[in-house]
């Protein structure tokens, strides 16, 4: 019984983690409110690939990655 609960708990957290990543990748790019000019990557769901945008440094959303590789790993499902 304990092992069943442990497996169920692990599966639940995997599902929540996957759903969270999926939702993150569906968000539009968001430059934020800062005045900086950092090149970042976001997943463009329409184009099905990671693209660059200029991030202001403050705020924004979670569809914001330091590298294209990070963006591809989280969102592109192997085709990037």
UniProtKB/Swiss-Prot annotation:
Tissue: Expressed by the venom gland.
Stated name of the protein: Kunitz-type serine protease inhibitor LmKTT-1b
The species this protein was found in: Lychas mucronatus (Chinese swimming scorpion)
Family annotation (CDD domains): Kunitz_KTT (cd22620)
Cross-referenced InterPro entries: Kunitz_BPTI, Kunitz_BPTI_sf, TFPI/VKTCI-like
Family per record: Belongs to the venom Kunitz-type family. Scorpion delta-Ktx subfamily. Delta-Ktx 2 sub-subfamily.
Record keywords, A-Z: Disulfide bond, Protease inhibitor, Secreted, Serine protease inhibitor, Signal
GO molecular function: potassium channel regulator activity; serine-type endopeptidase inhibitor activity; toxin activity
GO cellular component annotations of the record: extracellular region; extracellular space; host cell membrane
A Pfam family this chain is assigned to: Kunitz_BPTI
SMART domains in the cross-refs: KU (SM00131)
Residue ranges annotated for the BPTI/Kunitz inhibitor domain, each copy included: 25-75
Signal peptide limits: 1-21
Site residues, Key residue that directly interacts with the S1 pocket of trypsin: 35
Note in the entry: Negative results: has no effect on chymotrypsin and elastase. Shows weak inhibitory activity on mKv1.3/KCNA3 potassium channel currents (1 uM inhibits 50% of currents).
Function field: Serine protease inhibitor that inhibits trypsin at a molar ratio of 1:1 (Ki=160 nM). Is thermostable.
GO biological process, one term: envenomation resulting in negative regulation of voltage-gated potassium channel activity in another organism
Result after altering residue 34 to F: 1.6-fold decrease in trypsin inhibitory activity
PANTHER family, alphabetized: BPTI_KUNITZ INHIBITOR DOMAIN-CONTAINING PROTEIN, KUNITZ-TYPE PROTEASE INHIBITOR-RELATED
Disulfide topology: 25-75, 50-71, 72-80
Effect of substituting residue 35 to A: Loss of trypsin inhibitory activity
Subcellular location: Secreted
């Amino acid at each position: 019984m304990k092992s069943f609960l442990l497996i169920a708990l692990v599966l639940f957290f995997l599902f929540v983690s996957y759903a969270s990543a999926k939702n993150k990748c569906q968000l539009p790019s968001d430059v934020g409110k800062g005045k900086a000019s950092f090149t970042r990557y976001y997943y463009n769901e329409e184009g099905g690939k990671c693209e660059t945008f200029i991030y202001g440094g403050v705020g924004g959303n979670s569809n914001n990655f330091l590298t294209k590789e990070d963006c591809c790993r989280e969102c592109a499902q192997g085709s990037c």
